């Protein structure tokens, strides 16, 4: 309510003491008055304090080098991809912090991330590790389970519900989280020509994902499933959610070779080395991704492309032993609870890596191979109190002999 100007009583600002004749406007409250100049000054003070809070928030976000150091503790290899992710994630949260406090004319757009790499190269684990290091909610979705609205399957909004659930239904916290969408290459258009039939899980899903990736206020059913009339919805703004999408994109290196003018190797010809194909993955540009089947609008919302390389046997052995949560360390800890020491021969580790490569499962297949090798041991050991040490040999991994047991 504005203070009334009258001839009988002059109104003064309770903060600066100026009269209503000295300012443009005085607003009256419960026994107090404030002028337009003090309102403007208050806004400026609040803005400065918010900016200081933002700088404090940003100080808590690890710098790119610090993020890389964290990733190096858990993820073996993929140095180029880790650098790209560290920079992209830091810039994203820097953008979020400044956008929330600044009214600058410059609109800082979101830089979502596309990770391209073979199965088991560490795409999902990289995204998980980043979210954990930043202490933000994290959700994983499988693109192949998604359909556009009106078809049997999972609506894209259900991805947001997973993030809200990960944030314990704290929507404000969820709005600064990370979503990883896997198998994104599986919803690529099957060829560049538009199909006459309806594309339920291809271009339509890309269009649906596009809306939430670029930033929108989405209505999410609190219990998941399809939307129904008169159903109470959770409103969530996706403009500050970081989307990381990943896929194997099998065969995309051939598109890169074609673009670069090189002949694609056919049947019966000598194949290029894996290292050569790995270097082609670093040459991927948006044109190649579009030819693979992602629509231009969708690609445009994924400006950061991180290409992951096929893991070698040496990489897999390092994954087994070096990270803080390495599988060998985990199984050694498990057996230590039974008072038993666990040791892997070097050639046994290499045999595990070779099996994973043979099965084309990469790092994600390592645990199942160890489980197969150690099943009988883990069954028997708790009942054999005289066993003090178990040694896993190459023969044990290959199934031609049993692990070596040492007794007291």
UniProtKB/Swiss-Prot annotation:
Q: Which residues bind ATP?
A: 118-125
Q: Which residues form a coiled coil?
A: none
Q: Residue ranges of the ClpX-type ZB domain?
A: 1-54
One GO cellular component term, please give it.
HslUV protease complex
Q: Which residues bind Zn(2+)?
A: 13, 16, 35, 38
Q: Which InterPro entries match?
A: AAA+_ATPase, ATP-dep_Clp_protease_ClpX, ATPase_AAA_core, Clp_ATPase_C, Clp_protease_ATP-bd_su_ClpX, ClpX_bact, P-loop_NTPase, Znf_CppX_C4
Summarizing the function annotation, the protein's role is:
ATP-dependent specificity component of the Clp protease. It directs the protease to specific substrates. Can perform chaperone functions in the absence of ClpP.
UniProt-recorded name of the protein = ATP-dependent Clp protease ATP-binding subunit ClpX
Organism of origin: Streptococcus agalactiae serotype V (strain ATCC BAA-611 / 2603 V/R)
Report which gene this protein is encoded by.
clpX
